[in-house]
Amino acid sequence: MVRIAVAGAAGRMGRNLVKAAHHNPAAKVAAGSERPESSLVGVDLGELCGECKFDVVVCDDLAKQIDQFDVIIDFTAPASTLNNLALCQQYGKSIVIGTTGFTEEQREQIDLVAQQVPVVMAPNYSVGVNLVFKLLEKAAKVMGDYCDIEIVEAHHRHKVDAPSGTAIGMGEAIAGAMGNKLSDVAVYAREGITGERTKDEIGFATIRAGDIVGEHTAMFADIGERVEITHKATDRMTFANGAVKAAVWLHEKPAGFYTMTDVLGLNDL
């Protein structure tokens, strides 16, 4: 059984991760952390997420419980995630990263640490979204040369980064299938007189409103027809269950950088 620590356990996503780990027969909730100033430090993790008492309380530093867990699941913020990554590097633990908003330099740091410890990192842990990534690769190879490609994403009002990591992942899947780097073809905002659309660009539009869990659409538009590939999430447990699945899969894997494509065995599609 894989012993799981959840970083940011008292947040919306953290509570779902605790619940998902509790209900996964191959996993055990072994630790959970929050910021030292949080009033929820010391609260039982089971009671925190509406389950039975686990006899495992929220701590203010996972280093204090380093012997209690095998894998950290981290959906917090870049600085916090990098601290937990360093902890994994120091003690030989594995980590599942769902945090988004990393800079290019921070991504390079993650890649470097992944040479020493097992890391799964994905912009989205839903099975459906990762299948969409594969579908987008295939669509881009067939239609990318002659269609205009746009990505539209919508999330709740509290999301702090834009575009979403999933939207960027969709763009990377499309650009990679066409032999491009997303950074060379992405257009993240349009305003005023922009001129005509260039042939290779991939446009992004962002919506932040209400309580939208996550909606993403990639559009391949030609004259007379368009293809839209859409994923809509209605419950954060979708992401939490996928992340716990990744943690179970990652346990005892050799050091390396893995994605949900590896976890789900989608490379053969």
Curated annotation (Swiss-Prot):
Sites where the protein binds (S)-2,3,4,5-tetrahydrodipicolinate: 156, 165-166
Pathway it works in: Amino-acid biosynthesis; L-lysine biosynthesis via DAP pathway; (S)-tetrahydrodipicolinate from L-aspartate: step 4/4
A GO cellular component entry from the record: cytosol
InterPro entries assigned: DapB_C, DapB_N, DapB_N_CS, DHDPR_bac, NAD(P)-bd_dom_sf
Enzyme class of the recorded protein, top EC level: oxidoreductase
Active site positions, chain numbering: 155, 159
Binding site for NADP(+): 35
Keyword NADP: yes
PROSITE patterns: DAPB (PS01298)
Compartment(s) of residence: Cytoplasm
Any GO MF annotation of the entry: NADP binding
SUPFAM superfamilies on file: Glyceraldehyde-3-phosphate dehydrogenase-like, C-terminal domain, NAD(P)-binding Rossmann-fold domains
Catalytically driven reaction(s): (S)-2,3,4,5-tetrahydrodipicolinate + NAD(+) + H2O = (2S,4S)-4-hydroxy-2,3,4,5-tetrahydrodipicolinate + NADH + H(+); (S)-2,3,4,5-tetrahydrodipicolinate + NADP(+) + H2O = (2S,4S)-4-hydroxy-2,3,4,5-tetrahydrodipicolinate + NADPH + H(+)
GO BP terms in the entry: diaminopimelate biosynthetic process; lysine biosynthetic process via diaminopimelate
Positions annotated to bind NAD(+): 8-13, 34, 98-100, 122-125
EC number: 1.17.1.8
Function: Catalyzes the conversion of 4-hydroxy-tetrahydrodipicolinate (HTPA) to tetrahydrodipicolinate.
PANTHER family assigned: 4-HYDROXY-TETRAHYDRODIPICOLINATE REDUCTASE 1, CHLOROPLASTIC-RELATED, DIHYDRODIPICOLINATE REDUCTASE
Family: Belongs to the DapB family.
Name of the protein: 4-hydroxy-tetrahydrodipicolinate reductase
Lineage of source species: Bacteria, Pseudomonadati, Pseudomonadota, Gammaproteobacteria, Vibrionales
Gene name for this UniProt entry: dapB
